[in-house]
Regions:
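A residue-identity detector for tryptophan
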Residues: 20, 29, 54-57, 85, ...
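Alpha-helical phosphate/pyrophosphate-handling elements in metalloenzyme active cores
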Residues: 11-41
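Non-catalytic terminal regions of proteins
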Residues: 123-262
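Sparse, context-dependent recognition of short Cys/His-centered cofactor- or disulfide-binding micro-motifs
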Residues: 7, 28, 32, 37, ...
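Divalent metal-dependent catalytic cores for phosphoryl transfer on phosphate-bearing substrates
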Residues: 2-13, 23-24, 42-155, 163-170, ...
């Protein structure tokens, strides 16, 4: 779950809804400067389903007693977080091997590249190690299988897999920034391009509500792009998790529309 603030207060957006936005961008991604990617449908599906492991938790989110609000994805305990990423593997595998591989690699990439373990407990470190060990074995099995498949072998090279993994990470980060409401300039480095080293995307909000954003250089096929998802208006704060969940179940839906342009 992520939080989006506007003039009326808090909007909560589920991780699967945010992932859908990542998938919307994936399907419109690519031009002369940023190139294409393959296998197109499988990579788009991985982007769209990369947070499939959150589905169960989002139905009964936990309460952050310090804030009085539902936990965001950044506030959950490590064992809870790694368990969700572990559950994503068998769920995403129902869609196929290639999307499952990218979903799993996205999860391990988050811990290997971005997680700060300096304050983790011994239990946290053990949970991370167990998760990474099992996930790498899962990935290796899929890679061996895909490399023996005539349809997928050319898409299972280290170069192609690495590029596709990075694209999913870029779309994830873009979607998080946009769904949380962009208030100030941001950038995303090392974005894969058609040729040469990756480029840096500059994101600039046009207004104060984060509903219109300029991106440079422009990475999409269309000259403009409209993204959509839904959140729920959740006013107030709670001390009781069950009451928070009851309020969330009856909270009004809020359509979110974000316009991207060069």
């Amino acid at each position: 779950m992520l939080h989006r603030e506007d003039d009326e207060g808090l909007i909560v957006v589920s991780q699967p809804a945010h992932a859908w936005v990542a998938g919307q961008m994936a399907r419109q991604w690519g031009n002369a400067e940023f190139g294409e990617f393959a296998p197109h449908e499988e990579v788009c599906l991985a982007a769209e389903q990369h947070d499939i492991g959150w589905l169960q938790w989002e139905q009964a989110p936990t309460l952050n007693v310090k804030t009085g609000r539902p936990h965001t994805f950044m506030e959950l305990a490590v064992p809870t977080h790694t368990a969700m990423w572990s559950s994503a593997e068998p769920l995403s595998l129902q869609y196929g091997r290639y999307p499952a591989l990218l979903v799993s690699m996205h999860g391990t990439g988050l811990y290997e590249k971005y997680h700060d373990s300096s304050k983790d407990s011994s239990d946290d470190l053990e949970a991370i190690d167990d998760f990474l060990t099992a996930a790498h074995a899962f990935q290796e099995g899929l890679l061996c299988d895909l490399r023996e498949d005539p349809l997928f072998s050319r898409h299972a090279t280290l170069e192609t897999i690495t590029r596709n993994q990075r694209l999913v990470a870029v779309w994830d980060w873009l979607s998080l920034i946009l769904c949380m409401g962009l208030k100030e300039k941001r950038k995303i480095d090392d974005v894969p391009v058609a040729k040469g080293k990756g480029k840096t995307l500059q994101l600039t909000p046009v207004n104060g509500d984060g509903n219109e954003v300029r991106i440079s250089p422009w990475p999409f096929k269309r000259v403009t792009l409209t993204l959509r998802c839904e959140g729920r208006r959740l006013p107030g704060k709670w001390k009781d998790c069950l009451k928070m969940r009851e309020a969330l179940q009856s909270a009004p839906w809020v359509p979110i529309q974000i316009e991207l342009r060069a």
